[in-house]
Amino acid sequence: MTAHPETPRLGYIGLGNQGAPMAKRLLDWPGGLTVFDVRVEAMAPFVEGGATAAASVSDVAEADIISITVFDDAQVSSVITADNGLATHAKPGTIVAIHSTIADTTAVDLAEKLKPQGIHIVDAPVSGGAAAAAKGELAVMVGADDEAFQRIKEPFSRWASLLIHAGEPGAGTRMKLARNMLTFVSYAAAAEAQRLAEACGLDLVALGKVVRHSDSFTGGAGAIMFRNTTAPMEPADPLRPLLEHTRGLGEKDLSLALALGEVVSVDLPLAQLALQRLAAGLGVPHPDTEPAKET
């Protein structure tokens, strides 16, 4: 195992809307914090809080665990592999954690490229937004080797209350992309529901209040995400009665919504697709002798 200090020095690159509240949670880290942002004014509050402002990315390379929260793959690659980037100056054993949402192949490629130098590339995208970061309640999905994951757990726990070791480098990003896919598909579904409600002359703001209120109790889509496989359930699975009940309710309500859409002349393609795929998606597909309900 690579030798490393008992209390590592931390570095943070990128102090924007997401990075700033995360880095702020590290100001009292006993090993110290070095920050860098291309905007000098973004670093000023951190210097006032006791952090060291770096003059360039290369100065941050002196840290032992370095977090990066920049915009996209190109910026991530530039910070790490440019002529004056982290890869040129970081010592063996350094952990570079990428919190930006990037392509999974970017993390894999960087990890392979820097492995001979003894530099650990960790993809650690977060979920929860700036508000959760400020409270230390982010979820972080980590793609890392076992050694690196153990080393980042304590500092990352300053800004995250849920740390998931998703697997090797690239796995954290894959989990984040699946999570974000659910978010944005649900946004599209929300827009479809609003079109139906609007065509029925309903108050859309009131509908939003109902959705937020009920989701705070039911948990939204996450409420059915407890299985460790998407394969059809075994007959004796203890969750089967619950999900068969959910299937029945879902197919009934989706059928009613689609029928209402026909009455008010609103196309509901996501609802139609949901009706077709709900049973199999829940792991309780209809037997061949029991076709799914259709409108």
From Swiss-Prot:
Enzyme class: oxidoreductase
Entry keyword annotation includes NAD: yes
GO biological process: organic acid catabolic process
Keyword Ion transport: no
Database matches in InterPro entries: 3-OH-isobutyrate_DH-rel_CS (IPR002204), 6-PGluconate_DH-like_C_sf (IPR008927), 6PGD_dom2 (IPR013328), 6PGDH_NADP-bd (IPR006115), HIBADH-like_NADP-bd (IPR029154), HIBADH-related (IPR015815), NAD(P)-bd_dom_sf (IPR036291)
Active site annotation, chain numbering: K176
Keywords recorded for this protein, A-Z: NAD, Oxidoreductase
UniProt cross-references to Pfam families, sorted A to Z: NAD_binding_11, NAD_binding_2
Residue positions binding NAD(+): 11-25, 101, 252
Protein source organism: Mycobacterium tuberculosis (strain CDC 1551 / Oshkosh)
GO molecular function: NAD binding; NADP binding; oxidoreductase activity
The family this protein is said to belong to: Belongs to the HIBADH-related family.
Name of the protein in its database record: Uncharacterized oxidoreductase MT0794
EC number: 1.1.-.-
